[in-house]
Amino acid sequence: METVGLSRRFTKRYPHEFSGGQRQRIGIARALAVDPEFIVADEPISALDVSIQAQIMNLMEKLQTEKNLTYLFISHDLRAIRHVSDRVAVMYLGKIVELADAKTVYREPLMPYTKALISAVPVPDPQIEAKRTRIILKGDVPSPINPPSGCHFNTRCPYAISECKRIEPSLVEIKPKHYAACIRISPEHAHIEENEKAGLGRVGN
């Protein structure tokens, strides 16, 4: 308990007597009880106040350094992911669509879905923020039980062409250690983009 910043006397309390942040610390303490090397942290800071979120992330970073831990940090909070991650995997409808180190994903996203996500993250500098282009995705997220054929993102992608409905892209290395799943940038399907530029393809959703 003390390892996660809680007093030993808290062991005599009932669950309803703890705050959200304290319950998260207890969850971390339980995970540490088996002396793990790898921890899956699924939305560890969701539903917490911003100040408490920062405390939990700082605690996790501290424990990572002290105990040489590896985290799989699952979250919808893009700012938190950027803060704690060395590598980032972006998922859409249960499939990884981009994978690279965190700095690369945030600075040079390749997959259209990733680009849309990053464009939604506010920048503190108002002058830079004013010049940024927000990518607004149209339509609803399809059901993961019955996803669209081809690329699952094709129904919402602003860059989709007819082939995107037919071909399901693989996660391939586009740049050194930077992987993405998109036939329009994949070296495996270079002929598709060549045909599109030559006017032989057709844009459509």
Indicate where each model-derived feature is located:
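P-loop NTP-binding/switch modules centered on Walker-like glycine-rich loops
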Residues: 40, 44, 48, 52-130
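A short, proline-enriched helix->beta-strand linker immediately N-terminal to the Walker B motif
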Residues: 33-37
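Interfacial catalytic loop of ABC nucleotide-binding domains
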Residues: 12-14, 132
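Conserved ABC ATPase "signature" region
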Residues: 1-9, 118-119
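Conserved ABC ATPase signature
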Residues: 14-18, 22
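Charged, flexible cofactor/metal-binding loops and thiol motifs
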Residues: 101-204
